[in-house]
Amino acid sequence: FIPTFASHGFRYVEISGNGCDISKDMIISVDGLAISNIDIVTGEFECSNSLINRLQHNIRWGEIGNFLLIPTDCPQRNERMGWTGDMQVFAKTGAYNMNIKSFIDKWLDDLIDAQTMYNKNGAVPDTAPLGGDNRIDGCGGWGDAATIVPWEMYETYGDIHILKKCYDMMKKWVEYQSSTDRRNYGVRTVDGKEVPEQSDLATIPYIQVQQCRGDHLTYDNSTPYIYSATAYAAHSADILRRTAYILGKTDDEKRYTELFENIKRAFNDAWVNDDGSVSYYGEVSSQTAHCGESVALDGSVTRYTYYAENTPHCPSQTAYALAVDFDLIPTDKLKNTREYFKNSILRNNCKLTVGFLGISHLAPALSKVGLDDVAFKLLEQEDNPSWLYSVKNGATTIWERWNSYIAETGTFGDVSMNSFNHYSYGAIGQWFFTDILGICPVEFGYKSFMLSPKFGGGLTYAKGSFTSPYGKISSAWKLHDGKFTYDCTVPTNTTATLKLPNGDIHTLVGGSYHFEINV
């Protein structure tokens, strides 16, 4: 079976007429052929946990089913649009799993067209091509696909054409963000009330003021829109300054380096405390929050009320993930921030609360500050909300919501918007490659790269590969009798820097290698 003229996602099919008068043929079996614009597998991953293996399968299967003409959010309902937020969080995972270079190159043309056609000020609509319920004025974390996706593609494939083609779009988006910050809008009101003076948000320049989708479908709704939008504005400015350097645009590099530092400074003035913790105040968002307890470094516990006026909230997993992964925390505060970040996970019993904007940054941020053990606990969590909860309950692709289906009560999430094939939360897949296998580019396109495998949780082995533009990179490790054995393959004409778990560092050229260390 193969669809003609239209494609619809489905899981089950009913065949009627078999054995009746209308059919003289006996149907023995039916093969359904998936329609997709991507068919070259570039990433393989396997480990000792069968549920994680199924999760990896579901991530890839959802990618294949949604990458048709445009990266749709879901293939089975009346939406099926190229949501920018979905694509930017999944871009790196998608590029590890499959060769998406040509597919995304075409979609970036759609994104450029959408920006050019619908907003002359540089805003990026929420979908490309434009359609349905979205904002042509763009919003933080979604319009940032204009910078993030080209950058991720350049990192993976090393094709400078991508940056050259997209540079004007990237620059227009960052300039648009700059035009919508506090310097140009003055005091912000939410639901008719001014942002509280205690937070200093009413006067700090470079803070984003746009109201937008924020950390979409988060479980605790406690990350203010302007927090995530400002964090992403800093990240886009950072990407643009690096892009300007690569393209030899010296004046732009200087300008956007300064802009990044200014936004970072404003972010810290608004939300980062002297002790490295993050806090924000109730009236910065109209969302309803649930945040529980905050545990300070000295072990003292504070329970915050729920969006009471001028009351600081215990920050979300997303709040810390964005601040850490975007390098917004000053170095002298990072050690303390690490502990608060860890607590944001542990106080929720190692269950997820992140939404769309936090999902791709949570595990990488934890690893960045040496909290690999916490990242493994999150990955191996089987209770809701978690990545493996859907797997345990029969999912074959990634759910749109953490609570798309609750087995314990037999209930479904909001049926008006509840997709069972929605790739965004599959963004954890990048961490399988970058951290468990340890395959990361150093030189764009993997001319040189890192191999820094990590073990943790209950895993006893992991193995996999990534086919880079220079050839297949393989990485495999195993734990046995107190020893860590590691095998890898480095493509010809490339160089790898291997960092083993005990800290040993080796420089490798093309060939296959075997290592064994005590752990």
Residue ranges and their predicted role:
Residues 373-519:
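Non-catalytic C-terminal accessory modules of carbohydrate-active enzymes
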Residues 285-286, 298, 311-417:
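Extracellular polysaccharide-recognition and catalytic grooves
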Residues 89-100, 146-162, 232-250, 319-332, ...:
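Well-ordered alpha-helical scaffold segments within catalytic/enzyme domains
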Residues 5, 51, 79-83, 135-145, ...:
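Secondary-structure capping and boundary motifs in well-ordered enzyme cores
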Residues 44, 131-135, 211-225, 278-282, ...:
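Short beta-alpha connecting loops at secondary-structure transitions
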Residues 22-58, 64-65, 71-89, 93-126, ...:
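Active-site acid/base region of carbohydrate-active enzymes
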